[in-house]
Amino acid sequence: MMTSLYQCHPPNFCKKISLPVPVETRDSCMGRHNMEAPLLDEKNNNRNIIRNTALCFFFLLLTLSSLIFRDDFSYLLVKGGNKYNERVEVGGPDSVESDQGVVAADDARCSKIGVLMLKKGGHAMDAAVATALCVGVVNPMASGIGGGAFMVVRSLSTSQVQAFDARETAPLAASQNMYENDMRTKYYGPLSMGVPGEIAGLHEAWLRYGRLDWKTLFEPAIKLAKEGFLIAPYLGLSIAEHELLVMNDPGLKQVFAPEGKLLQAGDKCYNVELAHTLEEVAEQGPGVLYNGTIGEKLVKDVTQVGGILTMEDLRNYKVEVTDAMAANVMNYTIYGMPPPSSGTLGLSLVLNIFDSYGSADAAKGVLGVHRLIEALKHMFAERMNLGDPDFVDITKYVSEMLSVTFAKQIQEKIIDNATFPANYYMYRWSQLRDHGTSHFCVVDAERNAVSMTTTVNYPFGAGVLSPSTGIIVNNEMGDFSAPTEISPDMLPPAPANFIRPNKRPLSSMTPLIITKDNQLAGVIGGSGGMNIIPAVTQVFLNHFVLGMEPLAAVQHPRIYHKLIPNLVYYENWTVIDGDHIELADETKIFLREKGHELRAKSGGAIVQFVVQALQKDIERGRKFGKDSYIFHGTLTAVSDPRKDGKPAAV
């Protein structure tokens, strides 16, 4: 048996080579199932394109057969799977097109589940609920009902774009000095847990927009958790990288190392207790978590290991629903989350800086990359003044970050032939260093749209899985600032982000819906902590300003900057499907000549992207207001090839 690796040579050339698979690797893979088994329509029945990865050194035998598709979701599992030596499949298109609806998630199974809900007549929000629940099962290192989420929803029924803040909150017993004796407990263990909000947020949005039964939306995720799902390469890598975390927690160990050995990509994983929890929430609604038996079990598990979560915390949790924050940038209108998200404001500031040059050419070429780096540094210096507006007055900073005048003032500080030490950018506070997350985009036939980012923060959250509920606990308290914390950048912590009971921590999550002339132009968002804002900004510029096709806009190599250390991080890595992504040598040389210090980065943010063509193939849809029509152009959905997700189309 042979397996394929990719041998890469500069600048961007990768050559596939074949190596024999060791006997022990082949034997350990026997009986594994095909990740693409849960297909949702007949046109995918003959999929057999296999692409190997440089990160996983095993793939298995034989082509799939005997898949049975039924409306009861049995297609989520391989029939008689133990009879076959099957393979983990990460191939398939990173981009799909449709006139009727699309879902772009970071897992192919979840994209297809979302599309199934659209085919059943569901609103984009129905698809979003089912997709989010699926992601929480199959990508549990990044997402789940033990965490929180931001959602931006555009619905024709209300002619509004609304923001749903289901971000975790600090427990009632939390205080700004609670970690002064052991700062590690801010990031790991039960004390790092915020009050989870995802289920409450999904239910609140579904109540407003959903068409399908609440229970129906849970069935695919329940099936996956109860009867098993295949571990994708990205999850397999995360399990391996966090072996100590997994093996030190009884709940995580039971799910991800059930026989004392870590599960790997291609293995089947079960979380039966989570399936039971999802069944209860499906039957009884979110009250069973926030004021019922599931909540009581979760509180008991968390407090037994030293946490401070109480039933009162769960009962007090409220989803914040507001009009989405709107900003007019570069001839488009973006709709996103208000604070405590810093994403909408951060992206708006950077784009307004480019707009102030007076020409789209300002973003072109290697000089455009230099200007982007400088704009990002100014943005990061400004954004740490933000916090939860229910607790701190951030009116001045919100106004500045949306101001065209303020952006022009910053643009005048950007010099085209030089960069500067970090103190030039007028920083004051230590940066938020959030992690993880998962993002997906949904657009339906009516052009209703959902942009949702969901998170448990660090990989596997707090490193605690509640044994009685199967819920992985978030570590969102790590996103607060603490008065006594000494950060890697040696700057003082941001007072606007200090802990208070019921407060939401600052976030980099950037779910956006983009319109032009009141018509849907795009849906975008990303995962990857503080890398999200730079990544989403670059994809926006690549497509809407520089004219790249949607897939190319997402695939294009990216740069990142954190202000301190004063380093430009550039992508140089071979991703899950074997493609090598690296910043062009020409760009690296140019940036070094300007004084930038560069460092290669084998990682970055993951961006999902949906675009509607407004320049061609447009049909007028139904009237939604006086002399107003919804246009139906071709939808293109892209799942970032940096992870193992694939989009799906109706």
Region locations from a protein language model:
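Noncatalytic scaffold domains of N-terminal-nucleophile
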Residues: R51, T63-L116, A124-G285, L289-N291, ...
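Internal maturation/activation junctions in enzymes
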Residues: G80-N82, E259-G260, S356-V456, L465, ...
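Extended C-terminal subregions enriched in glycine
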Residues: P483, R500-R504, V536, V545-G604
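Alpha-helical support elements that line or immediately flank enzyme active sites
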Residues: M117-L118, A200-R208, Q284-L289, E296, ...
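Active-site rim segments in enzyme catalytic domains, especially the processed small/beta chain
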Residues: V137-R154, T158-Q162, L309-T310, A449-N518, ...
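Short beta-strand scaffold segments in enzyme catalytic cores
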Residues: S143-S155, S438-V442, P511-I513, A605-D617
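Short, low-complexity, Lys/Arg-enriched N-terminal segments of secretory-pathway carbohydrate enzymes
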Residues: M1-I49
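Short, small/polar residue-rich loop motifs at catalytic or cofactor-binding pockets
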Residues: V321, D434-T437, P459, S507-M509
